[in-house]
Amino acid sequence: MKKISETFSYGGKQAVYSHKSNVNNCDMTFAIYTPPNEKNAPILWYLSGLTCSHVNVMEKGEYRQKAAQLGLVVICPDTSPRGENIPDEEDNWQFGSGAGFYLDATNNPYDKNYNMYSYITTELPQLIESNFEFDMSRQSICGHSMGGHGALIMALRNPKKYKSCSAFAPIVEPSTASWSSEAFKKFLGENKDVWNMYDSVSLIKNGYSFPEILIDQGLADSFLEEGLRPWLLEEACKNTDINLKLRMQPHYDHSYYFISTFMADHLEWHKERI
């Protein structure tokens, strides 16, 4: 693991590291904010959306002041593998670099590198545990858009690993959304049973559960009707044990102006449950 940068902020440290990923067969980069009293601190994972890297939320998310106050570690991984030898479609912002969809690809040639589900749930936490003294028994997860999708499926499939889950404008049913279904086909092939394992609505319909989920969604979001469709998740959660808190926010769009407005709320919500 190599430290790329480190800067003090609100008494804690904002750092960026790179490391060799075995599951993605490339070097990966992540950002991490450690609060002033970092030993045995709980962890909040933040998963970013399409076209993003660890940089976007680090520069625009406005999480550090509240994380320092609450004593939360915030880890922001990249959204995909990157590099010259990574298969990609340079002109397609909805697939490949910056658009790994937090799944483990099964189709050649993508299966050698696009294993973001295993990376986030297993490999990166193991690296963190080996290099820091955080409390790995207290982890929570959140994300935005594609990252909200990632947070939801990881929480639903690993309810004992994460203490809480929240999302900003998540893609709740990527298997049927226009900007994600084609990526699923390229990454996963035609087997819809495999697709369902990376689709939060399908997971819930198939009996997967998580105690409580918080979602904020902007009503001025241009992707709301075709790409996000939170009402599908709301419908899936009916008659289940999932306590879904869906907050539809007037006037807000899909940008980091929206995310940063409600970031402190989400951090406080997670700290109460972690």
What kind of region is each of these model predictions?
Residues 1-274:
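Non-catalytic cap/lid and distal C-terminal segments of serine-dependent acyl enzymes
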